[in-house]
From Swiss-Prot:
Functional description taken from the UniProt entry: Succinyl-CoA synthetase functions in the citric acid cycle (TCA), coupling the hydrolysis of succinyl-CoA to the synthesis of either ATP or GTP and thus represents the only step of substrate-level phosphorylation in the TCA. The beta subunit provides nucleotide specificity of the enzyme and binds the substrate succinate, while the binding sites for coenzyme A and phosphate are found in the alpha subunit.
Biological or metabolic pathway of the protein: Carbohydrate metabolism; tricarboxylic acid cycle; succinate from succinyl-CoA (ligase route): step 1/1
Taxonomic lineage from the root: Bacteria, Pseudomonadati, Pseudomonadota, Gammaproteobacteria, Enterobacterales
Record: residues binding ATP: K46, G53, R54, G55, E99, T102, E107
UniProt catalytic activity: succinate + ATP + CoA = succinyl-CoA + ADP + phosphate; GTP + succinate + CoA = succinyl-CoA + GDP + phosphate
Source organism (scientific name): Salmonella typhimurium (strain LT2 / SGSC1412 / ATCC 700720)
Domain ATP-grasp, first and last residues per copy: 9-244
Any single Gene Ontology cellular-component annotation: succinate-CoA ligase complex
Keyword Transmembrane: no
Annotated protein name in UniProt: Succinate--CoA ligase [ADP-forming] subunit beta
Sequence positions that bind substrate: N264, G321, I322, V323
Length: 388
């Protein structure tokens, strides 16, 4: 679950991290009043969406008058911002962040993720602030410096100083950087985060560090013990199909293709998407119905998949280990009858009672194509989309 920039900075403030004075506003009038609270300009106005690339898309602007603030708010509030990280529809702009402008001397990067290879929380710092860290990692990986947190000791001040020295910081900036490092690490661990970024972390012309931007991603599996983060959730920024799937404990991610995929198991789902691509198809989604694929969940999965108007065919790929394939077949038949599926449905069953399940599908009299293998399933669903 992602947070908005203004929400990230609210958390920064609670943990004593320096950030520009700012207010999230939902109307042009509130935006003007926020500027008055902040004081003399210039100010920075920022569209609040769960996506990067806002500046290049016109969603961030330095303004020198309240008239400009009102014009920016009137232009963006209630609209959708399209960036390179969104789809063609963009994300809705429901808040504008109004902040005091900062005199930027130099831009740095500081962030942390859970590194699966080392099984540690790893902090990354770079002198290449203001640039996507993925781009830095690809083009100039030697400019990224890392430290891993020991789960027994947690973050240590010497690690912050180590990163500061590698960034070429001196004097009071080393102390300020270490404080920010310790604060970010504390937020990451106490709030069960999966990602935290300050990009850019700015050295002002006055010689101080300030968190100019903030990006936080919470671990969805830990939200049950983070009630204040749950309250910050903005479902308007999420795909409604993904929200509906979460209510049924279905793992769904919307994509841009036209072949709906329903699979039990995340690994099998990724493999299914790969083989669909291999045979020239484009998956419309990732959908893992999990081990408890009941008729009700299969029905709901069909509803979610078919709510995407781009879907021209559905591929169901089930491996019967925990669940029996004949019960899955009953669920598929019931779901197709209830939902009224009007696109071709290709089903591949393998494992426990697979033959009985295939027989039930064949005897159902419905427009369900039984595949003999995963390759056969991919070929048939691609052919169905192409009208062959």
């Amino acid at each position: 679950m992602n947070l908005h920039e203004y929400q990230a900075k609210q958390l920064f403030a609670r943990y004593g991290l320096p950030a520009p004075v700012g207010y999230a506003c939902t109307t042009p009038r509130e935006a003007e009043e926020a500027a008055s609270k902040i004081g003399a300009g210039p100010w920075v106005v920022k569209c609040q969406v769960h996506a990067g690339g806002r500046g290049k898309a016109g969603g961030v602007k330095v303004v020198k008058s309240k008239e400009e603030i009102r014009a920016f708010a009137e232009n963006w509030l209630g609209k959708r911002l399209v960036t390179y990280q969104t789809d063609a529809n963009g994300q809705p702009v429901n808040q504008i962040l109004v902040e005091a402008a900062t005199d930027i001397g130099k831009e740095l990067y500081l962030g942390a993720v859970v590194d699966r290879s080392s099984r540690r929380v790893v902090f990354m710092a770079s002198t290449e602030g203001g640039v996507e860290i993925e781009k830095v990692a690809e083009e100039t990986p030697h400019l990224i410096h890392k430290v891993a947190l020991d789960p027994l000791t947690g973050p240590m001040p010497y690690q912050g100083r180590e990163l500061a020295f590698k960034l070429g910081l001196e004097g009071k900036l080393v102390q300020q950087f270490t404080k920010i490092f310790m604060g970010l690490a504390t937020i990451f661990l106490e709030r069960d985060l999966a990602l935290i970024e300050i990009n850019p972390l700015v050295i002002t012309k006055q010689g101080d560090l300030i968190c100019l931007d903030g990006k936080l991603g919470a671990d969805g599996n830990a939200l049950f013990r983070q009630p204040d983060l749950r309250e910050m959730r903005d479902q308007s920024q999420e795909d409604p199909r993904e929200a509906q799937a979460a209510q049924w404990e279905l793992n769904y991610v919307a994509l841009d293709g036209n072949i709906g995929c329903m699979v039990n198991g995340a690994g099998l789902a990724m493999g299914t998407m790969d083989i669909v691509k291999l045979h020239g198809g484009e998956p419309a989604n990732f959908l893992d119905v999990g081990g408890g694929a009941t008729k009700e969940r299969v029905t709901e999965a069909f509803k979610i998949i078919l709510s995407d108007d781009n879907v021209k065919a559905v591929l169901v790929n089930i491996f019967g280990g925990i669940v029996r394939c004949d019960l899955i077949a009953d669920g598929i038949i019931g779901a197709v009858e209830e939902v009224g599926v009007n696109v071709p449905v290709v089903v591949r069953l393998e494992g426990n009672n697979a033959e009985l399940g295939a027989k039930k599908l064949a005897d159902s009299g419905l427009n369900i194509i039984a595949a003999k293998s995963l390759t056969d399933a991919a070929q048939q669903v691609v052919a169905a989309v192409e009208g062959k």
